[in-house]
């Protein structure tokens, strides 16, 4: 997924990903 790359640039995206799961 594209947001996997963003995880490195945007640590806050990790929170969003946790909410998705």
From Swiss-Prot:
Record-level Gene Ontology MF annotations: actin binding
PTM description: The N-terminus is blocked.
Key words, A-Z: Actin-binding
Job description of the protein: Binds directly to F-actin and induces actin filament bundling. May function as a regulator of actin filament organization.
Additional note from the record: On the 2D-gel the determined pI of this protein is: 7.5, its MW is: 71 kDa.
Family affiliation: To yeast fimbrin.
Protein name from the UniProt record: 71 kDa F-actin-binding protein
